[in-house]
């Protein structure tokens, strides 16, 4: 049985700013661009979150919600330096560290000799060292796979640890609302609820074929996740260049209206994937992919820095117009800035790899 830890620094950028300037502690704080320059919130502390402020929110909207909000511009060089220090700590326990962003990573400690191989003790020690050596807090989840470990790390935030042991997986996942499943956004969750599935336990009553009938190939993923099954490996060198979702339909989509109805579901799934990948501020382009009944395909894309349904609808219309034929496959996605993707995952070690790497 694997031992996977998901580590997630609490409000990373804001935590570093509060560490470096104690006058900011206890006051609502957002890191991001100025509202007059149409800036957005990169992250905010928990005092700001009490006002409903969250990452990716336009800063002007954040200031309306909290007129006393303190705004600090991002200091990316400083954040990368802190990330290097934190990842050096991770690498001291296992070489199997998969960066998801500057502030988030998976660790596979299955074969680690540290602390008698206890995933719980390793997570506790990592949190202690980051707090004492770096001066910020990390929340961690320990579980037999990546899906459950990521959910667990969010369970006792901030500055928390939650462990899901192998014998607890079944009951833990059964009680989860369907919204917690990877790739399920608002539209998909609403469809699941209309079909009578409120929790993963409810969803287990559905066979894989029935889920596939309603949700296409994503139905097979739902079938596994609602049972706590996730075979993805921790991949230390993974660099994400795009995020996408596509579906091949058992019955061709004959009209543009048919395509637009399905597009809404796909965009919802894409938004959920982008959010979980922490890739929202790395988007460079958006695209729509179509494969027609004659198996010929086309892709339409444009420069646009966020997931927005109207933009995808416009691209879909352009692509559909090219052939005006029934569509057998539909896909949506975003392309990421390659330099930013490197900065998020590889430039952590731009000044040389951490000890043990």
Swiss-Prot record:
GO terms for cellular component: cytosol. GO terms for molecular function: damaged DNA binding; DNA-directed DNA polymerase activity; magnesium ion binding. It holds the Pfam family IMS_HHH_1. Transmembrane segments: none annotated. It is found in: Cytoplasm. GO terms for biological process: DNA-templated DNA replication; error-prone translesion synthesis; SOS response. Mg(2+) binds at residues 8, 103. Coiled coil: none annotated. Its EC number is 2.7.7.7. It catalyses: DNA(n) + a 2'-deoxyribonucleoside 5'-triphosphate = DNA(n+1) + diphosphate. The active site is at 104. Keywords: Cytoplasm, DNA damage, DNA repair, DNA replication, DNA-binding, DNA-directed DNA polymerase, Magnesium, Metal-binding, Mutator protein, Nucleotidyltransferase, Transferase. InterPro entries: DNA/RNA_pol_sf, DNA_pol_Y-fam_lit_finger_sf, DNA_pol_Y-fam_little_finger, DNA_polymerase-Y, DNApol_IV, IMS_HHH_1, Rev_trsase/Diguanyl_cyclase, UmuC. The keyword rRNA-binding does not apply. Its cofactor is Mg(2+). The record marks 13 as: Substrate discrimination. Disulfide bonds: none annotated. Residues 4-185 form the UmuC domain. It is an enzyme of class 2 (transferase). Binds 2 magnesium ions per subunit. Its main location: cytoplasm. Poorly processive, error-prone DNA polymerase involved in untargeted mutagenesis. Copies undamaged DNA at stalled replication forks, which arise in vivo from mismatched or misaligned primer ends. These misaligned primers can be extended by PolIV. Exhibits no 3'-5' exonuclease (proofreading) activity. May be involved in translesional synthesis, in conjunction with the beta clamp from PolIII. Monomer. Belongs to the DNA polymerase type-Y family. This is DNA polymerase IV.
